[in-house]
Amino acid sequence: MGAALTASPKVLACSSQMKQPVKKDEQLPLGLRVDHPNVNSLRVVGITDSNMTKDLDPASSWARQEELVVKQVVSENIDKLACSLAETEDPTNAWRTIFVKPSHKSWTETVIAIKTNHISRQHTRSAVMAKICHTFTDILGVRPSNIRIYDACHGSSVSKNTPFSDLPEGCRIENKWGGSSVYTSVPEPWKKGTGESKCLKYLVDGSVDILVNIAMCKGHSQRFGGFTMTMKNHFGTFSPRPGHSTDGMDYLIAINRTPEILGEMDKRTRKILFPRQQLCLVDALWASKGGPGGNPTHQPNFLAMGVLSPIVDYQVATKFRGERMGWQPNMKTTHRMLTDFGYDESDLPAGGKIIEL
């Protein structure tokens, strides 16, 4: 499980040079909306199904959860979520709508990075990870060795402590994948768009084509809204260090507005040319009010998906964690996940609700 992109060098060639800083007037403007080419970026879908697990054991370890998860039901439900997200009845069509390859590459050549969360004791369940990986290989035709699973901050022992089962043969668990090692520009609101921070090399140099964000559903500091899900998951893509200062929320918003996460921006129109982060999934089969450490406290048997990270986090934080579980977020902070990306509550579809199956 090497940290270097050693397989298929023609496909995965990387530049060793430092990325040139992006000028402030070439950054994504604060409040500018980001759209997926095929999917409503404001649509967040969810499903609750007790049949996804065999028994209740809310505070269980990851190993125990692996025994309890019913993989086939999880797989079928993720297909249902994809259909609802893409607004189609056929799972194959749904996945081909959600995932978009670069025009100059075949699916075989396309490089996928999957950000998992490996801090402390709550981690992605194998059934969820395997379903997404098999979607790429079995439906779209991605070469398994071009799928890379990582956590650049806390991922040194992913392959040892959470050896995801049933992955396509050749799929790579990269652990830290070299860590956050290359400086890149970070836009507003952090440091008024003049700052830089370290990021995963393969996002900075453009080696990765599609980024998938698989997050947990845990509590965290009120500074970040009182929770950690898909946006804060990228504290394991970018260096988390600046995020733990007084302007940490600015940093969290800002790194999720970078080309490294969102995709390359047209310097003239300041629009995203090709979306990089194309799916955000919250694995709340188990979840916790507090965090980020410790075992889960609850077993909601819930999954949620969307294509735009701040919208997914806002909806799951307010509608699922807040309204359903009673874990109210810090709304002053949480509302920025809408407004700093150009949206408001009134823009959300389905009366502002998660679209539940």
List where the protein language model places each region:
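Extended, low-polarity segments enriched in aliphatic/aromatic residues
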Residues: 18-111, 119, 123-357
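N-terminal export signals
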Residues: 1-17
